[in-house]
A protein has these predicted regions:
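Bacterial N-terminal signal peptides
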Residues: 21-37
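C-terminal, non-catalytic macromolecule-binding modules
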Residues: 422-477
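N-terminal secretory signal peptides that target proteins for export/translocation
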Residues: 1-18
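Residue-level structural signal for beta-strand termini and adjacent loop
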Residues: 292-294, 428-430, 529-530
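Active-site bordering "gate/hinge" segments
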Residues: 38-404, 409-412, 418-421, 434, ...
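Hydrophobic alpha-helical bundle architecture
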Residues: 400, 460-538, 554-561, 565
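His/acidic/aromatic-lined binding-pocket segments of jelly-roll/cupin-type domains
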Residues: 414-415, 516
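A glycine- and small/hydrophobic-rich beta-loop-beta segment
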Residues: 389-398, 403, 411, 429, ...
């Protein structure tokens, strides 16, 4: 969840949690196009999977590739010059890297049947990462970690001298940050108690070269898509209950280049297209209610058809009308069934963040699983892996795919839990006790230091029942416990988790569509205003069985190293016990006036009101 204290609160965010005014929403779309990384979702023809990650070398590589790439040539030339000159200083860096993020993007935003935003831009940003001291103890240790990178805008053209001068200036700034930070680290280490985890600050990895070549992007029909965005947003006008709507299309072509003093040279092109449709309404008690549908593909050609999108909007409007009339849920503790998407978000928040490597070393963290390697942490029928090398599952593109992480390490599948037993963590180049190497999960948004992060978190099960039988299994569990009803969580918008030991080790998952499923055979009842809450160690042991189909949740996850695209994949899951609480909500009244053009709006000169549009059920 978006939070200023990202070191304390970690979570998934999506467009569904963005600002609720047109101007703020449009600005959020524009700002969201800025960050991207080596880990950005790749489309067909972009950087290949890590199965063929490229060659390795013990000396500088990629010189030939730089001949026709002015930016890469400028990076390598300035890196060599800076490395040679800084070696002569009293505090010579032992590691230096440049990463340049190049991004061309186009954004269309529509609302109420008209375009709100239509813009394109080219952005280029450079990160200069530097480490002084030695791998055992350097300037990035502990709370001084931000001193390891300085970021700034880079000239957009191919003027090599201008590019090198900017890199030179950023390198100078970074060196002047890193040296005092190292002094502070050494002083602090001398007066503080000995740390429990004495692992080095930086791992030694084999230098890698991978020079990906971007395919020509598919032709994009700007006029046709402008018209389509207006048409789609105009569809919401058929529904008076929907008082806010946004439809946005973001098309991005990106190129990330990374070179290091160790000899790595990694260039990864990527392409992605993302369509987001959102509708919002408000219940009589002031609770804001929303429905969001998100689609992504390598290009606009891979998005759903016009007919499919119209059907989604109709379903969103029907859901919103039903939510307005639904009762508010009461606090509850009992059997619950999570759809596959809901279970995917649940695992991302409750488990995934606690398996990120740096959290096992940081003494401010709760370290829920740090000393549980080799122990059972889930039911034996469940296994969990994180595999950023996979581009899609069941025909659905995965947002968490990447070929190389932000430290230039090839992405890898990591089996973190096998048959319920904890086996590993998601590692960047920050070693922890018993895990000395990266496994390709060092990720960050530009301007921030990488940490171990999730990519494609995948939950598999050997205790499966057909998905159409899961509801009956829920009813059986409700009857077994003597409860009047259980809860079914059909759709979800995101969540967040608390991981620092100064805070409760708790999580909160934010459902959108929730039903009461009665044991006595009454029809399911839609409810609203409910959040899933709990603590990880208790919640994860209460999974009874799972469905037999995998479901995908694509989103954007925010943590210390910024916002990165992620996917979570899981089957539907039955829990013997799940706790929910009432959701805090606003108490603003309904709009005083009806929207113009709706059946209840004022009509001048005594004209008849237009017929009320029908909602397809």
């Amino acid at each position: 969840m978006s939070n200023s204290e990202t070191s304390k609160v970690t979570g998934s965010i999506g467009v569904s949690q963005w600002p609720r005014t047109l101007a703020a929403w449009a600005l959020a779309v524009q700002l969201a196009c800025a960050p991207f990384s080596l880990a950005a979702p790749a489309g067909n023809g972009s950087a290949g999977s890590a199965d063929a990650a490229g060659s390795s070398s013990d000396k500088p590589v990629g010189k030939d590739a730089a001949v026709n790439d002015v930016v890469l040539r400028a990076m390598q030339n300035e890196l060599a010059r800076a490395d040679a000159d800084l070696t002569k200083t009293e505090q010579a860096p032992y590691y230096l890297s440049y990463t340049v993020y190049d991004q061309d993007f186009m954004v269309l935003v529509g609302s109420y049947g008209s375009l709100l935003q239509d813009f394109a831009a080219h952005r280029r940003q450079a990160d200069v990462a530097m480490r002084v001291g030695d791998p055992a103890l350097d300037n990035t240790h502990g709370q001084s970690r931000p001193s390891g990178v300085t970021s700034g805008a880079l000239p957009l053209g191919d003027d090599q001298d201008a590019l090198q001068r900017t890199l030179w200036e950023l390198t100078d700034r970074e060196y002047k940050r890193a040296v005092p930070a190292l002094l502070n680290v050494r002083t602090s280490s001398a007066v503080r108690a000995e740390e429990e985890d004495k692992s080095p600050d930086f791992s030694k990895e084999t230098p890698t070269t991978h020079i990906g070549k971007a395919s020509a992007p598919p032709a994009f029909d700007h006029a046709a898509w402008s018209s389509e965005i207006k048409r789609l947003s105009g569809e919401f006008r058929k529904y008076p209950e929907v008082y806010f709507d946004i439809v946005s299309l973001t098309v991005q072509d990106a190129n990330a280049r990374m070179v290091s003093s160790e000899g790595s040279a990694v260039v990864t092109p990527s392409a992605s297209t993302r369509l987001v449709m959102e509708g919002q309404t408000r219940a009589n008690d002031g609770m804001e209610l929303l429905r969001v549908e998100t689609f992504q593909a390598p290009s606009a050609d891979g998005l759903p058809s016009e007919k499919e999108l119209d059907a989604k909007i109709d379903k969103m409007a029907v859901d919103l009308k039903a939510l307005r009339e639904a009762p508010v849920a009461e606090p509850y503790d009992g059997p619950a069934l999570l759809s596959g998407r809901a279970a995917a978000v649940f695992f991302h928040e409750v488990l995934g963040h606690r398996l990120e490597g740096h959290r096992q070393k940081d003494e401010e963290e709760g370290q829920t699983f740090t000393k549980k390697i080799g122990q059972e942490v889930l039911p034996k029928f469940l296994s969990v892996s994180d595999d950023p090398t996979i581009k899609e599952i069941g025909g659905i593109k995965l947002a968490g795919y990447y070929a190389y992480d932000n430290e230039g390490t090839p992405s890898q599948r990591v089996d973190v839990i096998k048959d319920g037993v904890l086996k590993s963590f998601l590692m960047s180049r920050m070693p922890i006790k018993d895990f000395a190497q990266s496994n390709g999960h060092g990720r960050n948004q530009p301007g921030l230091m990488p940490t171990g992060r999730q990519g494609n978190l995948i939950v598999t099960s050997t205790e499966k029942v057909p998905e159409d039988q899961m509801r009956q299994r829920l009813i059986d569990e409700v009857k077994k416990q003597g409860k009047p009803y259980g809860l079914y969580f059909d759709d979800i918008q995101g969540g967040f988790t608390l991981t620092q030991r100064s805070l409760p080790q708790a999580f909160q998952v934010l459902p959108v569509i929730v039903y009461k499923v009665y044991a006595d055979g009454r029809p399911d009842e839609l409810v609203r205003g409910v959040d899933i809450v709990g603590t990880p160690l208790a919640a994860l042991t209460r999974i009874v069985t799972t469905g037999d189909q995998q479901h995908v949740f694509n989103g954007v996850c925010g943590a210390e190293s910024g916002s990165v695209p992620v996917s979570a994949v899981a089957p539907a899951m039955l829990f013997s016990e799940m706790e929910v609480q009432k959701r805090q909500h606003a108490h603003e009244r309904q709009p005083i006036l009806s929207p113009p053009g709706t059946p209840d709006s004022a009509t001048p000169n005594g004209q008849n009101k237009p017929a009320k549009p029908e909602v397809n059920q």
